[in-house]
Amino acid sequence: MISANNVTLRIGKRALFEDVNIKFTEGNCYGLIGANGAGKSTFLKILSGVIEPSKGDIAITPGQRLSVLEQDHYKYDDYQVLDTVILGNKRLYEIMKEKDAIYAKEDFTDEDGVRASELEGEFADLNGWEAESDAATLLNGLGIETDLHYAYMRELDGGQKVKVLLAKALFGNPDILLLDEPTNHLDLDAIAWLEEFLINFNNTVIVVSHDRYFLNKVCTHIADIDYAKIQLYSGNYDFWYESSQLMIKQMKEANKKKEEKIKELQEFIQRFSANASKSKQATSRKRALEKIQLDEIRPSSRKYPYIDFKPNREIGNEVLHVEGISKTIDGVKLLDNISFTLGHDDKVAFVGPNVNATTALFKILAGEMEPDEGSYKWGVTTTQTYFPKDNTAEFTSEDSIVDWLMQYSPEKDVTFVRGFLGRMLFSGDDGLKKVNVLSGGERVRCMLSKMMMSGANTMLMDEPTNHLDMESITALNNSLIKYPVVLLFTSQDHQFVQTVANRIMELTPGGLIDKQCTYDEYLENDEMARKRQILNMEAEADD
């Protein structure tokens, strides 16, 4: 068990947390939620001891081991992948290295023998004999193939490093597991594997995530941060939402009844306070009036941007025809003879672990990259807008947000642009920020603003939910459900994909799988699973 006792954290004059008391117990998974800036990641750092609270303390059951998902992707560059995972249990790793050093000695002494015996006992107690196989199981489950297990971390790309660091956090059955955005940069297959792992994990988990489906799947409780307090709810994310809305509704109804009672008492007092025969009753009602306290109902600190895509023209029946597109980058064949045709009602989600292939295809269709072979043709009634996964190149200038967005605005009017930005949660002086210093979430909101202004009737969106908070994801999700024309997108947010897409495509090493269905139907379809397996086997045979 881990608990926060009267924890207060002040940053300058602001209290990020004020007298927080909460217990996280064994066998439960707690989803830590709150608006951007509420302090979710900071609270995890307080629990792990990285940040010292201004007041109060953190208590952990003696002897329990705490494990944290680390965010530094370069810290273990000089370690092999398998060793990095085993470092999740630092004591076990130290024992393994000390044992190896002793047994490598040429002049093995009696003292060495005694020490080796001690180490072997501790090694066995920590399940050391299963360490490498357990680490390999975690890596394979997350999609890190066996041939990479003995590679050095510096040889891996960013997405692979994220998976290794996650495996490190999960390794060795920790008593308390702290996970900050564990689904970031994971493909949907890896997320599904992590969901099953956490569902079957018997110890304490505290997780921060913007993935609503993930929180619904794994959480037994929700800890909601708002106004420097943390309120604990039993149940998953959807249950929290319904419970919190019901609580507010009940408080409003109770306040309404109290206000009616106050009005009734005030009218009686005003009418009869000067009446000698009624003075006792008036005095009694004054006392009753003084006892009535209205519940304080604070509006949630959560804010939702206004996202609404409106095409400027209707789209015809001919939308997009792709014929035999192939692309190899750095010696890796990402696209192999890909062909498909889009209709005017298609909302296509590209799924599967081959995210680089999807990015390459989107760049080709957006005109930013040439295919090695094949061709594509957009319909004459289509207008396209593109959301790249990496938007760095869009934000290198010294322009303010207002000036940056003005380039894409149909109305060259500062008041119009500021109003538009206000709906996207850039208020007051936010519009004067230089775009080259914006956070990831701010950049995404700028890109979405640009796309809304385009009035396009066809959208390409490569991971638009990355860097967004839950409120912004919800707003984008609802907008794309309503979006009346063609959409090609990819996202690692299960609920986002399930509620938006009506057609699923998967770019496998052996070719394209294409199915007109929802994402859940695709996952449950045995025929699609067999087809995926056959295509992967054919690709391996060709290699």
Identify the meaning behind each predicted range:
Residues 136-142, 267-271, 287-292:
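Short amphipathic coiled-coil heptad-repeat segments
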Residues 103, 241, 270-273, 277, ...:
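A structural signal for long alpha-helical coiled-coils and helix-turn connectors
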Residues 1-255, 309-543:
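ABC ATP-binding cassette signature C-motif
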Residues 298-314:
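Short, flexible cytosolic linker that couples an ABC transmembrane/permease module to its adjacent nucleotide-binding
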Residues 130, 277-281, 291-301, 377:
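Proline-centered turn/helix-capping motifs that create local helix->coil transitions or kinks
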Residues 251-265, 271, 278-287, 303, ...:
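ABC ATPase nucleotide-binding domains
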Residues 113-116, 186-187, 283-294:
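Extended non-transmembrane interhelical loops and adjacent amphipathic helices
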